[in-house]
């Protein structure tokens, strides 16, 4: 995804989901728009992966745990998707930086056990 595509997708989220003009958006609103754009990308990747594994009749293993301390995910997701540079470039159009958006993200820490943390690594 290019910086221009990211910028347009964020503008769309700001205008149609949050009803705010992009040039008037706060860092918190920009964070939410960026998170929604990333979520959409991850959903597309998950759908493609699921279709492939279903077609190849591969098995899946499910593990559910609410006991984990993964921390904030925006920065990690950008890095894992290889989108740090395009997002950084797109955010300059909004007059902000990734660091300012990272500061807006709440920490979703749940529980404090080692098993959930261990499971999250896999």
PLM regions and their residue ranges:
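A conserved ligand/cofactor-binding region detector
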Residues: 1-122
């Amino acid at each position: 995804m290019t910086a221009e595509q990211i910028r347009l997708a964020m503008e769309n989220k700001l205008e149609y989901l949050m009803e705010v003009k992009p040039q008037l958006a706060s860092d918190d609103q920009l964070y939410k728009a960026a998170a929604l754009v990333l979520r959409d990308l991850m959903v597309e990747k998950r759908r493609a992966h699921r279709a492939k594994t279903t077609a190849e009749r591969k098995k899946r293993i499910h593990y559910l745990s609410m006991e984990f301390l993964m921390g904030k995910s925006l920065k990690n997701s950008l890095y894992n998707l290889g989108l740090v540079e395009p997002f950084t470039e797109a955010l300059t159009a909004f007059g902000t930086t990734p660091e300012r958006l990272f500061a807006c993200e709440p920490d979703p820490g749940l529980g404090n056990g080692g098993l959930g943390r261990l499971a999250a690594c896999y």
